[in-house]
Regions:
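Conserved N-terminal beta1-alpha1 strand-loop-helix module at the mouth
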Residues: 1-226
Length: 226
C-alpha cells in the first residue's frame, strides 16, 4: 500500500513505521507538491525496500526522468494524459512506471501499449479524493498489477480490497490530519488504514512490492562516486 502526498520527513517515517510498502511524492502542481531536493533528502532516510514514487501530471519526459533519478526514486507515476509513447520512453529510463487512468477510461483496454509496470485506477476526477463505483475496476486490466485509488479511507479500504482484489491501494487525503499543513498525515488514520488493508488480505499474502525485487533502489554510493 502506498501513502501518497508526502511533504514531510516525519510523515514518510511514520508511514514506514506503520507498515506501508510505498510512499509517494507529488511533483505536479498541488497543495501537496514537494520540491525534488526535499524529496531526495527524505528518500535517503528510508529503508531500501520501500517503494518510493514520484507523481507527475503531463510533465516533460526529460524532467520526469531527471527528478526520478536524481531524487533516488524507484518509480514514476504518470497521472495525466501521457501518451503510450511517452510512457514507454520514460519506462526505458527509470526503474518503474505506474500509469494512472480514470475509472472507465477506454484506454484501459489498450494498457499494454503503455509498457507500464503497474496500472493505477483513480476516480473520474483524479486526485479529488472521491470514491467511484469499484465495479469499474473489477477484472480490468486483466493480468496486470492494479493499484486502486480514489477516496480510500480506513473505513472503506477493506471493502475495496475484497471487492476489487487489487495488487495495491493508494491513499492521500484519507489519512491526512484535519489540522496542520496540507498533506500532513494523521498517525492514527495511517495506522488504521494499514491495519484495515492488511486485515482484508488473504492469509500469508505476499507484500505487493515483493515481486519488484528485481528493481533495486537508487544506488547512492555509485552516484556519489561519479
Amino acid at each position: 500500500m502506498k501513502i501518497c502526498g508526502i511533504t514531510r520527513e516525519d510523515d514518510a517515517l511514520l508511514a514506514v513505521a506503520m507498515g506501508a510498502d510505498a510512499v509517494g511524492f507529488v511533483f505536479a502542481p498541488s497543495k501537496r507538491q514537494i520540491a525534488p531536493s526535499i524529496a531526495r533528502d527524505i528518500v535517503r532516510r528510508l529503508p531500501p525496500e520501500i517503494l518510493t514514487v514520484g507523481v507527475f501530471r503531463d510533465e516533460a519526459p526529460s524532467r520526469v526522468i531527471d527528478i526520478v533519478n536524481t531524487a533516488g526514486l524507484r518509480a514514476a507515476q504518470l497521472h495525466g494524459h501521457e501518451s503510450a509513447e511517452t510512457s514507454r520512453l520514460i519506462r526505458a529510463r527509470v526503474p518503474l512506471v505506474i500509469k494512472a487512468f480514470p475509472a472507465g477510461d477506454p484506454e484501459l483496454d489498450r494498457v499494454d501499449d503503455y509498457g507500464a509496470d503497474a496500472v493505477l485506477i483513480d476516480s473520474p476526477r483524479p486526485g479529488s479524493g472521491e470514491v467511484f463505483d469499484w465495479s469499474l475496476a473489477e477484472g480490468r486490466p486483466d493480468g496486470r498489477r492494479v493499484i486502486l485509488a480514489g477516496g480510500l479511507t480506513p473505513g472503506n479500504v477493506a471493502d475495496a480490497i475484497r471487492q476489487v482484489g487489487p495488487w495495491g491501494v493508494d491513499v492521500a487525503s484519507g489519512v491526512e490530519s484535519d489540522r496542520g499543513e496540507p498533506g500532513q498525515k494523521d498517525a492514527r488514520r495511517v495506522k488504521a488504514f494499514v491495519e484495515a488493508a492488511r486485515g482484508a488480505l488473504p492469509p500469508r499474502a505476499p507484500r505487493p512490492v515483493d515481486d519488484l525485487d528485481g528493481f533495486g533502489p537508487y544506488d547512492w554510493m555509485e552516484d556519489d562516486a561519479r
